């Protein structure tokens, strides 16, 4: 079977940001959601956060040790269930579970199949959640996906996220992010209305026309990897990946 998904929030052009903006603040962020908030503020000129981050889990049958760059969770009584639990008050929010040990794929394997995820006491159905949540027994993580799991969108309710811990684990980031959907839709609407779709394609070349002054930086939504070369008005320009 084949599934085709449409991204209603795709911004198919470049965005202008101030030349004086320090993009290091994104790379030096302490968490995934902090990085997203810093990127959002740079692109939108909004001082408010796009995400609220929650990491104060209630522990049941668990002992946590704060290490230098990570946290170690140990099940106290191996014969009894162990849980991490928190409740988020939602009002038109999209929720994500952030579970990350490292950006190195080989290290993330160590936390695979550590949890079963429950939303309001209902086991998250792997076939109805997303394509990264693949194990038939409902455990997570199971496939490297930047450590994020889509928990769904909620209008006006309290949502309780409970993680059943299946074994001891070490982790760098464990949190739930709540995205303000209204704020995000407003951001996308503003950006898509401001910039015209002047992108053309020719084999392995992507062209975009835009007008800016010397005080702006062109931010492209095109995914970047090694091998890309950028020319502006025929002159080679360096690319900074953020």
Predicted features by range, described:
Residues 1-33, 122:
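Aromatic/acidic, Gly/Pro-rich catalytic loop(s) in extracytoplasmic/lumenal soluble domains
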Residues 5, 11, 47-242:
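Active-site-proximal, structured, solvent-exposed surfaces of multi-pass membrane proteins
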Residues 19-29, 34-35, 177-185, 201:
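General structural signal for secondary-structure boundaries
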Residues 21-64:
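Catalytic-adjacent loop/helix segments of enzymes that bind and process anionic phosphate/sulfate esters
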């Amino acid at each position: 079977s084949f599934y085709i998904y449409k991204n209603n929030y795709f911004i198919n052009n470049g965005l202008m940001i101030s030349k004086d903006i320090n993009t290091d603040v994104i790379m030096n962020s302490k968490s995934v959601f902090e990085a997203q908030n810093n990127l959002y503020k740079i692109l939108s000129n909004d001082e408010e956060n796009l995400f609220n981050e929650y990491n104060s889990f209630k522990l049941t049958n668990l002992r946590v040790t704060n290490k230098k760059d990570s946290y170690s969770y140990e099940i106290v009584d191996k014969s009894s269930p162990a849980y991490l639990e928190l409740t988020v008050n939602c009002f038109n929010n999209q929720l994500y579970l952030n579970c990350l040990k490292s950006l190195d794929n080989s290290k993330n394997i160590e936390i695979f199949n550590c949890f079963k995820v429950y939303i309001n006491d209902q086991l998250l159905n792997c076939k109805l959640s997303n394509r990264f949540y693949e194990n038939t027994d409902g455990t997570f993580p199971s496939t490297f996906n930047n450590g994020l799991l889509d928990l769904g969108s909620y209008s006006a309710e309290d949502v309780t996220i409970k993680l059943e811990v299946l074994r001891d684990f070490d982790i760098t980031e464990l949190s739930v992010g709540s995205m303000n959907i209204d704020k995000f839709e407003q951001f996308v609407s503003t950006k898509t209305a401001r910039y015209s779709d002047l992108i053309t394609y020719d084999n392995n070349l992507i062209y975009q026309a835009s007008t800016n002054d010397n005080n702006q930086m062109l931010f492209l939504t095109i995914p970047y990897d090694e091998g890309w070369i950028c020319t502006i008005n025929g002159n080679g320009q360096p690319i900074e990946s953020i």
